[in-house]
């Protein structure tokens, strides 16, 4: 569909949100999206576009906590953002509540949140490196790579780690 990106289809109350995202910052996605829609045998009713930041950004700005897209919590390679945003939002909420309750100073909550977010740097860097590699490998390698990644021994080792994000 899009070599340097991802496609999605989310059912929403009687209709669907279908889209494409580009890792390469490509902004001409309408034609590939229309081709994707034709393949699904659906017609678009409305188009909307934006960027989604993938890769950890600043978890705090001054005395403000950043969560989700504002902090770059979207996972590189997969484009998944909801689960990391919920996870980091919960961490943030617990720390803010601790500060409100007087259990920790506010500055300590900011510091603890930064530490919790930055503890995930390695995982984000690995996904970013995989994203970089996939974008540059010959198209003929993608099928065999997907088959390799789907092997039971590989899935058993890596899929639980991916699914356990934030646990």
Tell me the role of every PLM-derived stretch.
Residues 1-30:
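Conserved FAD-binding catalytic core of PHBH/FMO-like flavoproteins
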Residues 3, 26-27, 79, 83-86, ...:
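Electropositive phosphate-/nucleotide-binding environments in soluble metabolic enzymes
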Residues 13, 68-70, 117:
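Short, small-residue-rich loop/turn micro-motifs
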Residues 16, 42-45, 123:
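Short, structured loop/turn "capping" segments at alpha-beta junctions
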Residues 22-101:
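FAD/FMN-dependent oxidoreductases across multiple families
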Residues 97-167:
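C-terminal helical "tail/cap" subdomain of flavin- and related membrane-associated enzymes
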């Amino acid at each position: 569909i899009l070599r340097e990106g991802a496609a999605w289809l989310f059912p929403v109350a009687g209709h669907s949100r279908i889209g494409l995202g580009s890792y390469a910052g490509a902004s001409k996605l309408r034609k590939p999206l229309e081709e994707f829609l034709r393949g699904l045998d659906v017609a678009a009713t409305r188009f909307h576009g934006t960027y989604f930041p993938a890769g950890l950004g600043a978890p705090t700005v001054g005395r403000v906590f950043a969560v989700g897209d504002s902090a770059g919590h979207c996972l590189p390679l997969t484009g998944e953002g909801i689960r990391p945003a919920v996870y980091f939002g919960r961490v943030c909420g617990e720390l803010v509540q601790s500060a409100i309750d007087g259990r920790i100073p506010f500055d300590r909550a900011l510091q603890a949140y930064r530490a919790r977010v930055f503890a995930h740097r390695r995982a984000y860097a690995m996904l970013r490196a995989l994203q970089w590699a996939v974008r540059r490998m010959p198209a003929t390698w993608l099928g065999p790579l997907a088959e390799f990644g789907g092997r039971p021994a590989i899935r058993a080792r890596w899929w639980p780690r991916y699914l356990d994000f934030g646990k």
